[in-house]
Structure formats: structure tokens, C-alpha cells
From Swiss-Prot:
This protein's name: Molybdenum import ATP-binding protein ModC
Entry keyword annotation includes Membrane: yes
Residues reported in the UniProt entry to bind ATP: 33-40
Pfam families, A to Z: ABC_tran, TOBE
Source organism per UniProt: Methylococcus capsulatus (strain ATCC 33009 / NCIMB 11132 / Bath)
Keywords: ATP-binding, Cell inner membrane, Cell membrane, Membrane, Molybdenum, Nucleotide-binding, Translocase, Transport
Encoding gene (name): modC
NCBIfam families the UniProt entry points to: modC_ABC
Length: 356
């Protein structure tokens, strides 16, 4: 099975990195954590930008670094996208892409035309970087990284320097990379929204350590992680648009375990879509509530309960069929309902965020 194995130890003044993990060789793996958690340092170690004496790195069994072997960055078949688009100002967009092609080695995994089409930059090829918007520059930087025909693409918070409008413009292009290219992506981010929208796998980091790693949906639904805290705690579901009710302007999203109704956004029936359900938008009941404004009522079973940092709050994980959902309750409510593990409950979902 294709995979990336990374083991690094750094002990710098004021910072320590100690990781030993295996990353999947397919899909998008998000390295997630707060600033200073070590995610960018780990990415730079994988790229060979940081040379760490105590380290070992293999890609699909091929050694890139150990006690005796060191493959320098320029000889590693990888593409790297920084926070700021580092384009050559004296070259046109096409010139920047051709520069990337010069670094390509081995079989062509992504052609120049394919990179241009995937990132939607065909109309920009004759422009210099100073005539591009921030989002356009970053799309060109990603296309140049792909022009290297990399075996793995490393992305260090590529949207961090962009405003919200530019982020929304570029996210669909990142989704296309995920859907149309068979190249593993390691994606550094501290944004739960980006992670929920793009990632297949999650590596959560804190103070230079990996505190959790695994498939995105199951890892986000864990209750023993600091990432569960705050307003961003929630679950991710992969759904399919099952019906559009034009009379009420609603759409039904079917997922393993049930269905959710949400505002109709014109997405065609049959389209696969990822949705995010925040814990603050979920409540629980012992009996089905008939007279309520909440449209989404699902049958579930309590799977786990965990205290929050706030003494008055608890986080409850409920399984709806195969799918986990999180609910944030006051402890008073949990006590009044007699919430215990294994109990059957009605899950009331007030709001659903479409990751599109």
C-alpha cells in the first residue's frame, strides 16, 4: 500500500517537534492545529527544507532520509506551495509555469495544459505577476507546483494570505485537484472550514506532537481531543442530493443513516456533496417533537459523553446509522434528559453547512 512514513525529532530553544506517523499515499491529508503547533515545521521537514539529523522519511518504501541517505529538496519529486505566491516577477505566467517544468523528473503526471485547465488560468498566461489578483497569483503558484509533475504536493496554508472573497474563489479549484488528480496532498491549515471541505484524512497537532490522526469524519468526531472545543466543534458527512422540493425551495441530502433538509441552492439531484453539522446546531430529545420548527429529526443512539472545559457544558456523540454527530448540551439538560451511553434519542439538527 502506498504511504508516507515520517519520523522527526527536533529540540530547538523554545520549540520541540516529536512525530512518528504514517500518512496515506492518496487523497488530501490536512495537518491541522493552532499557530506554533508544528504543522509547518513538519511539512518543511518532509520537503527537506529543514534538515533534521534525527529523522527518517520514506515515500512508498523509497528512502528520502535516514541516518545514511539524504535526498536534497531539489531532487525530491514534490511540489511546494507557500502561503505567499513566490512567482518570478520578471516572467509571465507561462514563463513561471515553464520554469516549473524544468524541474520535472520521471514520468509526466500532470501536463502543462492540464495544470492550466485545472486552475483556470488560460486567460492569464501572458500576464506578469504584478497584473494578477492575490487569488490569481496563488492559482498560478499551484499550477507551477503541478508542472513539476510531483509525486506529492505540499501546501502550506495556501489561502492564509487571501481575503474571504479570494478564498471562496480558489476553493473550487482545490476541490478539482482532489477530484481529478491521483497525487497525494499534504495540506497545512488552521481553518476548520478548509479542513472540513477539502480533507480526507486529518493529522491534529499540538505543541510539536501528533495528538490524533485518521480518517477525517471519525477523527473530527472524537471527544478526547482539544480540537473538539470551541464553536467549531462538529461533524462532517458525505451526502448526496436526493430531492429538490421546488414548492418550498428545499433540498434533501441523503447520508448513511438518514436525510437532512436544507435550503435549495440549485445543486442537481444525484450530486455528491459534503456537509458540516456544528455541535451548537444540534439538540437532543427523549421523544420525537412534533410541534417544532426544526425540520431535521433523526433517530440516533448515544455513543459517548465528554465534559467540556466549561463546567456547565458537555459534548455528546450520537450515532445516526453509521454516521457520528456531535451535540453540545448544558449539563443540566443532559441530566434532565438522563443522557447515558447506549440510550436512544431524537437528534434535532437546526442548521447544515454545505461545503461547496
Amino acid at each position: 500500500m502506498e504511504d508516507i512514513h515520517a519520523r522527526f525529532h527536533i529540540d530547538w530553544p523554545g520549540f520541540r517537534l516529536d512525530v512518528d506517523l504514517t500518512l496515506p499515499g492518496r487523497g488530501v491529508t490536512a495537518l491541522f492545529g493552532h499557530s506554533g503547533s508544528g504543522k509547518t515545521t513538519l511539512l518543511r521537514c518532509i520537503a527537506g527544507i529543514e534538515r533534521v539529523s534525527a529523522g527518517r522519511l520514506t515515500f512508498n518504501g523509497e528512502v528520502w532520509q535516514d541516518e545514511k541517505i539524504w535526498v536534497p529538496t531539489h531532487k525530491r519529486p514534490l511540489g511546494y506551495v507557500f502561503q505567499e505566491a513566490s512567482l518570478f516577477p520578471h516572467l509571465t505566467v507561462l514563463g513561471n509555469l515553464r520554469f516549473g517544468m524544468k524541474r520535472a523528473s520521471g514520468p509526466v503526471r500532470v501536463s502543462l495544459d492540464q495544470a492550466v485547465e485545472l486552475l483556470g488560468i488560460g486567460h492569464l498566461l501572458d500576464r506578469k505577476p504584478d497584473r494578477l489578483s492575490g487569488g490569481e497569483r496563488q492559482r498560478v503558484a499551484i499550477a507551477r507546483a503541478l508542472a513539476v509533475s510531483p509525486r506529492v504536493l505540499l501546501m502550506d496554508e495556501p489561502l492564509a494570505a487571501l481575503d474571504l472573497k479570494r478564498k471562496q474563489e480558489i476553493l473550487p479549484y482545490l476541490e478539482r485537484l482532489h477530484d481529478e488528480l491521483d497525487i497525494p496532498v499534504l495540506y497545512v491549515s488552521h481553518s476548520p472550514d478548509e479542513v472540513a471541505r477539502l480533507a480526507d484524512h486529518l493529522v491534529a497537532m499540538e505543541e510539536g506532537r501528533v495528538i490524533a490522526a485518521g480518517p477525517l469524519k471519525e477523527t473530527l468526531a472524537r471527544l478526547d481531543l482539544p480540537i473538539r472545543l470551541g464553536e467549531d466543534a462538529g461533524a462532517v458527512l458525505d451526502a448526496v442530493v436526493g430531492e429538490r422540493d421546488e414548492s418550498w425551495h428545499l433540498a434533501r441530502l441523503d447520508f448513511p443513516g438518514g436525510s437532512l433538509w436544507t435550503r435549495d441552492r440549485g445543486i442537481p439531484v444525484g450530486r455528491k456533496i459534503r456537509v458540516r453539522v456544528l455541535a451548537r446546531d444540534v439538540s437532543l430529545a427523549r421523544q420525537r417533537q412534533e410541534e417544532t420548527s426544526v425540520l431535521n429529526l433523526l433517530r440516533g443512539r448515544v455513543d459517548a459523553i465528554e465534559d467540556e472545559d466549561h463546567p456547565g457544558l458537555a459534548l455528546v456523540r450520537v450515532r445516526v446509522g453509521e454516521s457520528p454527530l456531535l451535540a453540545r448540551l448544558t449539563k443540566r439538560s443532559a441530566s434532565a434528559l438522563g443522557i447515558v451511553r447506549g440510550q436512544e434519542v431524537w437528534v434535532q439538527v437546526k442548521s447544515v453547512a454545505l461545503m461547496e
